[in-house]
Every structure is written in C-alpha cells, then in structure tokens.
UniProtKB/Swiss-Prot annotation:
NCBIfam families: nucleoid_noc, parB_part. Coiled coil: none annotated. GO terms for biological process: chromosome segregation; division septum assembly; positive regulation of sporulation resulting in formation of a cellular spore. It is found in: Cytoplasm, Nucleoid. The gene is noc. Keywords: Cell cycle, Cell division, Cytoplasm, DNA-binding, Septation. This is Nucleoid occlusion protein. One of its GO terms (cellular component) is cytoplasm. HAMAP family: ParB_Noc. Transmembrane segments: none annotated. It comes from Bacillus mycoides (strain KBAB4). One of its GO terms (molecular function) is DNA binding. It comes from the Bacteria.
Amino acid sequence: MKNTFSRLFGFGDKESEFELQDESHEEIAKKVYEEIQEIPIVNITPNRYQPRTVFDDARIEELALTIRTHGLIQPIVVRQYEDDKYEIIAGERRFRAATKLGWEKVPAIIKNLNDTETASVALIENLQREELTAIEEAVAYQKLIELHNLTQEALAQRLGKGQSTVANKLRLLKLPEEIKSALLEKSITERHARALIPLKNEELQLKVLQEIVEKQLNVKQTEERIAKLLEEVKPKRKAKQKAVSRDARIAMNTIRQSLQMVANSGLNVNSAEEEFDEYYQITIKIPKKK
C-alpha cells in the first residue's frame, strides 16, 4: 500500500504520476534514512512552505523537557540549499525545542528534494498531525492545489477527505484578514467563521465578529444574529406596476379636468379615485341642492 507522501509527490494530472510506482517501502525508507548528520542549528532555517504560523510556546516547552529527558528520538528532516545551509522539511517543533534547550547541533536526515517536493512534504506532514488551525489547514490545501495543479475533488481524494470538507476550508480564505486572524488566535471557532460567510459584506462581517468576541456568542447565537441581519438587508420587492394605456390616462385626466371645472362653478362635488388590478374606479357625488 502506497503512503500519502508517495501519492502526492508528482506532477501533472494523472494519478499515476503522483506515485512512486516501482519502489517498496523498504527502498523508500532506505532513501529517507540514508544520511543522518549532526548539523549546527545556526545553519538551519525554517521551511518557507511551513503552513503552521502559530506555535504554542507551552507545548514547545513540554517537548523540550521530553527531549532533555529522553533525547531526540526522531531526527528532523532537512534539505541542503547552499553550502552549509539547510532548510527544514519536517520537524520544526523539534527544531524549536532543541533551540530552546540551547543545543548547538541537532541530528538531521538530509534529503535531496526540489521546491515542489519540499513544499508537499511540509504541508502533508503538518496536515497528518491534525494540529493546524482551520486557516492554516485551508492555506495548506490551497498550496497543494497550486503546486500540483489539482482540483478540489482530486485533492480530497488524495488526502482521503470529503470534497465538502476541503471546499468548506477553502471558503475561509475569502474572509477578511481580521476574521482569519481571529481564527488563528482561536478567538472564534471554525463554525463561527463559516457562519459569517453568507453575509458577504465585509463591514457586517467585522461587526458580527466584534459581537462574537465581546458578547461571547456561541455558534447558534451567531447564526441567529446573522439570519436577522440577512433579513434586514434583503432587498424589498417592489410592487409590480401594470402599464397604463395612453387612452386610459387621457380619460382619467379628462374626468379630473371636468370635475375641476364643476368645482370652479361653485358646485361642491366630491370624488374618490380607486385603482384596481384591471381598472380605475372614480366615484362622484353631486349634491341635489346647491
């Protein structure tokens, strides 16, 4: 059975091109672990394709304590991009923990990968850990789509996820930066953010975001608030006006002018006009006595 990494390392549209077809797990493992070195930490840089933008300092501290006690059991994975310069492919949390411990060198597996492969490994390695925020996950999906020229459906198949899951994550990227930041900082949940999408209007979205944070609205309260706002901004349907023929307008104006002439003669005439779907009705009351 081929692993997720092998299915995603490739180019073009055909699924076969995303797979390492003729290599066993043992051969792949041999390639991965063929070179381990102690590399100076100052010569290592974070992965430019790292989808994770928020690192929990408390958890890094916990990891550092574990490494101090048991050592670094799993080396980080890097690639060399210049003489004595290395970029992390996988294991940035371990790298940060080792740095926190004051290590001068860290054991690393050196792999020969190009930019596309490096990005794919970094993105998938983080996606598999399921520790990313919803926005970080959405960014990872978008980068994989761009790197491999995939459709949402194709990406979902390769990750073993439903297409709706991928689509819902990607919709979050259309939200204003303030809302995406709130998601990253975990001030709101993914369901809060998804509820804001139908508003469309950025000003309204930010207004509701402020209400969610300040009033600690739960998801149901947020959805009810948004439903009310959508009802308020819904354009009112104008009553359909039927076209009035030229002859009808002439007739109405003639009657009005005649009534005005009678009134000018000193006779107190009362009239009332009513408009129906198919006709106008004019009621005229003329007193018998002046």
